[in-house]
Design a protein with these regions (language model features):
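Class I S-adenosyl-L-methionine-dependent methyltransferase catalytic core
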Residues: 1-152
């Protein structure tokens, strides 16, 4: 993780991005919509290293592409962590499809890896835009799928 930029979408408390900072990530960007979770995220960032945290309260599908666009000319490699909520609430039934579309629309060369956390029963696409599935690790009811940039 050393010297990489980390973006955590659907950040919640920010635990994954903050762990990336503790392992040497240069900076972490967090997107969280829920007001209560966002307040916890801010508190956690202050406790770790606020200088390395950039937070935004807002819609992941709007804010994450803005972060990616902002960082497109960075020489640093980016790791994008996408963790849509498992519990489907009204209006969120298509959360995975929207997440896949967001990933498919990424058109920058400096994203090193995309990690998608998901329910383990979900069959993940082999290809999402410019990114190919490398492996999936299952942990009970959840799983992590790792996508890497595919050179054209």
């Amino acid at each position: 993780m050393e010297w990489k930029i980390f973006i955590e979408s659907f950040a919640g408390s920010g635990s994954i991005g903050l762990e990336a900072i503790s392992r040497g990530a240069k900076r972490a960007y967090f997107v969280e919509l829920d007001r209560n979770s966002y307040q916890i995220l801010l508190k956690n960032c202050r406790a770790v290293d606020m200088e390395k945290c950039q937070t935004v309260q807002g819609n992941t599908f709007v804010q994450t592409p803005l972060f990616i666009d902002f960082l497109k000319n960075s020489k640093d490699e980016i790791v994008l962590y996408v963790d849509p909520p498992f519990d489907y609430r009204d209006g969120m039934e298509d959360i995975y499809e929207k997440s896949f579309t967001m990933i498919k629309n990424i058109d920058v060369d400096n994203i090193y890896m995309i990690i998608v956390e998901h329910v383990s029963t979900l069959e993940m696409p082999e290809v999402l835009g410019r990114f190919s599935l490398n492996k999936t690790k299952k942990f009970g009811k959840s799983a992590l799928s790792y996508y890497f940039y595919t050179q054209e």
